[in-house]
Amino acid sequence: MGIPSASYSITMRVHLGADPLGIGRITTAVGEAAGTVVAVDIVESHPDLLVVDLTCNAVDARHADAITRAVGAIEGAVVHAVSDRTFLLHLGGKLEVASKVPLRTRDDLSMAYTPGVARVCRAIAANPADARKLTIKRNTVAVVTDGSAVLGLGNIGPEAALPVMEGKALLFKQFAGVDAWPVCLATQDTDEIVRAVEWLAPGYGGVNLEDIAAPRCFEVERRLRESLDIPVFHDDQHGTAIVVLAALANALRVVGKNLADTRVVLSGSGAAGVAIIKILQTEGAAQIVACDRAGVLHKRREGLDDSKRWVAEHTNPDGRTGTLRDALAGADVFVGVSGPGILEPDDLKPMAADAIVFALANPDPEVDPAGARRHAAVVATGRSDEPNQINNVLAFPGVFRGALDAGARTITEAMKVAAARAIAARVHDDELRPDYIVPSVFDRGVAPGVAEAVRHAAGERPRE
């Protein structure tokens, strides 16, 4: 069984009789059912009745049901209601539009809206660049998805993707002050996605592509980067790649190795995998071997799509063949952006001394982290309940903050590398250790540091 977490947190409204040990009995029941008690709040107290709200964390929904049954089985305890705290948090959505301008007088109204707003409209019509300083455009990002590759849920459609996009927008605002808004498109046709974003672009200062399946995501991003004069950034690719580079730079410091001299094995040749390859090569990695479900990608393999063909032609200089396990022999680094449980811990044993393992599949990594630590000096995952969490939130808020502030028209590879270096630098020499190679997602210095680095790397004077 996994570890109880807040993502499966419930609150039970429990009625207890006069038994003074009632609270102790129900909290014990939660513990015996392998749950974690978070809080006990007394709602009502009477001589013969005690009403409490019992909040606890579970491993999953089925486990939460089992905990509820265990509490209800206690003599004298009656569970009257159960609330899923995650669903409660999402009621009515997680975002709202707030006004920056007071509307208390006729003067306020005549300046914010008609007739005064017409003068501003004419100014922008005469000089469209003024939209950046006279509208929300300079600080607004569209979070665009077609719902085709949402988290580990797959192709669930635009409506079901909306809670994730809301969460993304929330992170933009919380960590970098960027006003982001979900744009969930009811199409998975590449031409229609590109056209829709082009039509919407005048109202935004940047476009964050999210959860669009490969290989479609590559063409969508490429075409939008060519046609728009605002930054376009596919976070599943580049956000992941930036944080992987940051974490790997620090992990290599821990084990005393250089990226140029290491052999990296990568599992997963989708959106994130391709971006990781590109950013590592930009930083000097020369020995990268990529694998998919069928094994090592190499130039002689047939039946590869365009993205995998690119990977085969730009990696694996020694022409290695075989399986993922074959590729791991003697490798210094394993990076997994593929699927759960594809490796056993002992599969890592043939790796080089002081190996580095990044098993980033979510929610279940490619290899058990505890088992991986028997064979690797540094282990990272994508999970918040494990040390060294590789989380895109370390990158994308600051990347867009810096790009928007610089008035950048695109996000270059140099800007991505600068972001990675800024993230890595947040872990100081006296803090660096095998279980601390990336800063906390709640480190308030990360986004400003990334923004400054990106702004400097943009090499452009801010557009007014």
Regions found by a protein language model. Give the residues of each.
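A conserved regulatory-domain signal marking ACT and ACT-like small-molecule sensing domains
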Residues: 1-93
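Flexible, glycine/charged-enriched surface loops at secondary-structure junctions
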Residues: 38-43, 80-82, 183, 210, ...
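Short, structured coil segments at secondary-structure junctions
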Residues: 75, 176, 227-228, 284, ...
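Glycine/serine-rich phosphate-binding loop and adjoining beta1-alpha1 elements at the start
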Residues: 79-262
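Glycine-rich phosphate/diphosphate-binding loop of Rossmann-like nucleotide-binding domains
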Residues: 151, 156-176, 228, 234, ...
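Adenosine-phosphate binding glycine-rich loop
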Residues: 231, 235-236, 255-258, 359-464
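Rossmann-like adenosine-cofactor binding region
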Residues: 309-378, 383-385
